[in-house]
């Protein structure tokens, strides 16, 4: 099956109200349970991560400018100190649990604009998405909204796992180590583009791999494609990959209603976004001056491995469950090659751009920030692998690899400030755990970021180890004896009946 080819549409079972309810009820339950689990920790997050830090306050300032002034010029908003609305009192209360130090005057993240005034360099999409929740109830309602988006990501993860023949319980069990670990759970509380992008990418990918879509489903795909570039320009390569895997199915649609539902949102976005850039930058694309610089070819390779192995920000250090994607890739190559090529079409261009960034780790934020939007797609190879091995093997392997990630996330929830690291090479959580036992963290894992890098030989050896391990696991997936393609259960009846 080629990259642009989707499965042919088999005969669909009747879409009865009972069948639809049978799918919507478990999905609603998944969303509610995830939201409840996330919401349990909101008080701790809000108390410890106060005031807003990283990029978060700048999205709020843009939202306040839109709400109060109806414009994007934030000159008066900073002059008036609008940020004091989400800052703690001065002096701090005696029971203060938030950040021990922060600037009392928020320095703006200004774009290099050709227009007079002060415009944020951050994408406009997040500010627009949080505008209504923030006006309704400030940070609390905004976090609840983020929790809802994260819960919808969880529901899509489960639906994608079911594509590979798993029942509801099996799909949920496979999704838990992704949903309740870094990076997805960390960014479920933070005003960043990541969790919005994660939902848009997995939904568009999932619908793109189904044989048929209804008009509302095509509209959802179109909205996902339209929103992503407004969250951040770095998502444009992922959008192009999604278009590549969606175009064949769109061209096969016989209904112009369904075609228009998918086409109109991204078409409007494709016109509006360059117009916005022209107004801000005087050119139809964002300014490279708004970034902290870019890597040379050797630095790109270093960043590519650092995204996974860096002690402070590496994905595999914080959630080793993602190692199983390598063996899953081997399984997909043998059983669902089109799915694998579709994942690579979305992921590789995006990863190449992120590795090109000098600050590839996302600076002041939890681990694996730039990998969070792609993290939900890991359920596809994970579920494909789990469908090819004995259940006991899947349970034990997933359990063992999930435990470190769940434990690290528990540590972050107990002390949320430890999600953030100074670029000194030492993981704040690991250092804290060692100190609680009266020990010094021995720094077992390498550092790839340029401010405190490990010796180049150490980084090269770890990179070689990861490359060999990934190749070995992928080869193992290729050699696994087939157990029958349980994924064939994914019929048109399922694809139409599920959102």
Give, region by region, the residue ranges found by the protein language model.
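Start-transfer (signal-anchor) and selected internal transmembrane alpha helices
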Residues: 1-44, 162, 258-265, 395-400, ...
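Membrane-interface alpha helices of multi-pass inner-membrane proteins
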Residues: 63, 174-179, 207, 217-232, ...
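Interfacial juxtamembrane loops and adjacent helix segments
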Residues: 68-126, 130-134, 290-296, 358
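Loop-to-helix entry region of an early transmembrane alpha helix in multi-pass inner-membrane enzymes
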Residues: 113-131, 135-155, 172, 186-191, ...
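Transmembrane-helix motifs of polytopic, lipid-linked glycan transferases
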Residues: 141-165, 198-203
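Perimembrane helix-loop-helix junctions
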Residues: 206-210, 237-267, 324-336, 380, ...
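Membrane-lumen/periplasm interface segments of specific transmembrane helices
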Residues: 229, 258-328, 343-357, 375, ...
């Amino acid at each position: 099956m080629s990259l642009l080819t989707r499965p042919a549409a088999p005969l669909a079972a009747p879409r009865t109200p009972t069948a639809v309810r049978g799918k919507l009820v478990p999905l609603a339950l998944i969303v509610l349970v995830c939201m409840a689990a996330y919401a349990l920790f909101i008080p701790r997050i809000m108390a410890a991560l106060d005031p807003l830090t990283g990029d978060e306050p700048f999205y709020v300032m843009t939202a306040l400018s839109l709400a109060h002034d109806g414009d994007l010029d934030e000159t008066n908003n900073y002059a008036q100190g609008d940020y004091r609305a989400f800052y703690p009192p001065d002096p701090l209360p005696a029971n203060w649990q938030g950040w021990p130090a922060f600037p009392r005057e928020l320095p703006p993240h200004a774009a290099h604009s050709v227009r007079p005034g002060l415009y944020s360099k951050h994408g406009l999409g997040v500010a627009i998405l949080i505008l209504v929740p923030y006006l309704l109830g400030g940070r609390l309602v905004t976090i609840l909204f983020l929790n809802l988006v994260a819960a919808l990501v969880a529901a899509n993860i489960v639906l994608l796992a079911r594509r590979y023949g798993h029942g509801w319980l099996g799909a949920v069990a496979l999704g838990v180590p992704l949903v309740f670990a870094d990076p997805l759970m960390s960014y479920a509380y933070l005003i960043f583009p990541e969790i919005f992008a994660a939902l848009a990418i997995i939904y568009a990918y999932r619908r793109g791999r189904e044989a048929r879509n209804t008009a509302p489903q095509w509209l959802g795909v179109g909205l996902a494609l339209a929103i992503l570039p407004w969250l951040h320009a770095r998502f444009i390569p992922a959008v192009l990959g999604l278009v590549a895997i969606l175009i064949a199915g769109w061209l096969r649609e016989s209904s112009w209603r369904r075609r228009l539902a998918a086409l109109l949102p991204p078409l409007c976005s494709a016109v509006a976004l360059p117009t916005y850039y022209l107004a801000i930058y005087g050119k139809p694309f964002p300014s490279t001056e708004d970034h902290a610089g870019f890597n040379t070819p050797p630095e790109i390779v270093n960043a590519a491995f650092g995204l996974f192995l860096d002690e402070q920000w590496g994905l595999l250090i914080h959630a080793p469950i993602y190692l199983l994607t390598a063996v899953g890739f081997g399984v997909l190559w043998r059983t669902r090659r089109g799915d694998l090529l579709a994942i690579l079409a979305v992921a590789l261009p995006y990863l190449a751009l992120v590795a090109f960034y000098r600050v590839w780790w996302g600076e002041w934020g939890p681990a694996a920030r730039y990998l969070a939007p792609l993290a939900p797609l890991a359920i596809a190879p994970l579920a494909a692998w789990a469908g090819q091995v004995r259940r006991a093997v899947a349970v034990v392997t997933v359990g063992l690899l999930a435990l470190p990630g769940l434990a690290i996330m528990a540590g972050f929830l107990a002390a949320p400030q430890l999600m953030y690291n100074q670029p000194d090479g030492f993981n704040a959580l690991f250092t804290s755990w060692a100190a609680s036992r009266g020990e010094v963290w021995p720094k077992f894992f390498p550092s790839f970021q340029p401010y405190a890098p490990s010796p180049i030989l150490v980084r090269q050896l770890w990179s070689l180890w990861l490359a060999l391990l990934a190749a070995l696991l992928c080869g193992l997936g290729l050699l696994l004896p087939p157990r029958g393609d349980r994924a064939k259960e994914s019929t048109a009846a399922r694809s139409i009946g599920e959102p």
